[in-house]
């Protein structure tokens, strides 16, 4: 069994998974959304204090598994350094106390493994990762083989939703509130499609965001129409760039992972792409789209099999990570 810890942002989560069967034996998550919503975004110091409070409470519920643990896994990159620290400190303590190896998991790779909870890996696969501050197209061919096809030049998909929600005076996180408001509106606000005439495969959301700001300031449009127009254009930009990547790399399998993969409009548009290009489309179960320790445990199972262990003295917190570019 592996015990995993996730504390990279504003979700505190622990999981226990069987190594051979990949069966999820325990999974619990405490979200901090309510506490941060009053500030319109995540406050790192507050998040850190809330993790420090929640982690021991959840750990208490996992004690029955301690005698059978073969390793402890923890998200150590990327994320907020003060929140990553909370999870890493607990993982180190468990590694020493139980005399078991430590596995440091890249949170973004963890999101890919959210597809495979209680399932076998599917590879090779092209992956659209839309999680928090990240919007990337990746090529996945196993735990040791993830490379980057494209990334964002400025804001991520998720950040742009949060910022537009803030401009409209809506709550945090922006994804669900924009998605719900958009259902009541019409796509009538003219917004630019970024990088339309650029040959590269990349993302950019600053232009759409600025156009939304000008539309709000003009006073001509209802909030629901702005939300609908923004969401449609933001998703169109994703599909436009993914289409370029799909034409170039011709994947048999294509997955969408990360918090924004819960967006139903986004799923709908990629279903259309799947039918057009003939690839198999995958996304995680809804409960595993946002940050969770189950996906960290699932990635750690593959790392355990390959002996990818760290000494408790050597584990480092890495707030930012870059993948190698695909050749």
Swiss-Prot record:
GO terms for cellular component: cytoplasm. It comes from the Bacteria. Disulfide bonds: none annotated. Its main location: cytoplasm. One of its GO terms (molecular function) is N(6)-L-threonylcarbamoyladenine synthase activity. Its EC number is 2.3.1.234. Substrate binds at residues 129-133, 162, 175, 263. One of its GO terms (biological process) is tRNA threonylcarbamoyladenosine modification. Transmembrane segments: none annotated. Binds 1 Fe(2+) ion per subunit. The keyword Transport does not apply. It is found in: Cytoplasm. It catalyses: L-threonylcarbamoyladenylate + adenosine(37) in tRNA = N(6)-L-threonylcarbamoyladenosine(37) in tRNA + AMP + H(+). Its cofactor is Fe(2+). SUPFAM superfamilies: Actin-like ATPase domain. Keywords: Acyltransferase, Cytoplasm, Iron, Metal-binding, Transferase, tRNA processing. PANTHER family: TRNA N6-ADENOSINE THREONYLCARBAMOYLTRANSFERASE (PTHR11735), TRNA N6-ADENOSINE THREONYLCARBAMOYLTRANSFERASE, MITOCHONDRIAL (PTHR11735:SF6). Required for the formation of a threonylcarbamoyl group on adenosine at position 37 (t(6)A37) in tRNAs that read codons beginning with adenine. Is involved in the transfer of the threonylcarbamoyl moiety of threonylcarbamoyl-AMP (TC-AMP) to the N6 group of A37, together with TsaE and TsaB. TsaD likely plays a direct catalytic role in this reaction. This is tRNA N6-adenosine threonylcarbamoyltransferase.
């Amino acid at each position: 069994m592996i015990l995993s810890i996730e504390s990279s942002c504003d979700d505190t989560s622990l999981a226990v998974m069987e190594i051979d069967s990949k069966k999820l034996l325990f999974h619990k998550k405490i979200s901090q959304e309510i506490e941060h919503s009053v500030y319109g975004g995540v406050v790192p110091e507050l998040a850190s204090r809330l993790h420090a409070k929640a982690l021991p409470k959840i750990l208490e519920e996992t004690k029955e598994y301690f005698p059978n643990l073969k390793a402890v896994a923890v998200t150590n990159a990327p994320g907020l350094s003060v929140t990553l620290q909370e999870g890493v400190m607990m993982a180190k303590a468990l590694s020493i106390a139980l005399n078991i190896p430590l596995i440091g998991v890249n949170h973004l790779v963890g999101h890919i493994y959210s597809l495979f909870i209680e399932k076998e890996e599917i590879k090779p696969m092209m992956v659209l990762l839309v999680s928090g501050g990240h919007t990337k197209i990746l090529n996945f061919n196993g735990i040791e083989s993830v490379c980057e096809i494209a990334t964002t030049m400025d804001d991520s998909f998720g950040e742009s939703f949060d910022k537009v929600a803030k401009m409209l005076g809506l709550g945090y996180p922006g994804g669900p509130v924009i998605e719900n408001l958009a259902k009541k509106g019409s796509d009538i606000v003219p917004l630019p499609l970024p990088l339309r005439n650029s040959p590269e495969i990349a993302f950019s959301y600053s232009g759409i965001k600025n156009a939304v700001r000008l539309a709000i300031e003009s006073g001509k449009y209802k909030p629901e129409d702005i939300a609908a127009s923004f969401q449609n254009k933001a998703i169109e930009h994703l599909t436009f760039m993914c289409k370029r990547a799909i034409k170039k790399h011709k994947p048999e399998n294509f997955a969408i992972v990360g918090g924004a993969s819960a967006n139903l409009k986004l799923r709908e548009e990629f279903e259309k792409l799947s039918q057009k290009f003939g690839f198999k489309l995958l996304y995680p179960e809804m409960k595993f789209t946002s940050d969770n320790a189950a996906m960290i445990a699932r990635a750690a199972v593959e790392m355990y099999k390959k002996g990818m262990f760290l000494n408790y003295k050597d584990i480092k917190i890495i707030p930012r990570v870059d993948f190698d570019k695909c050749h």
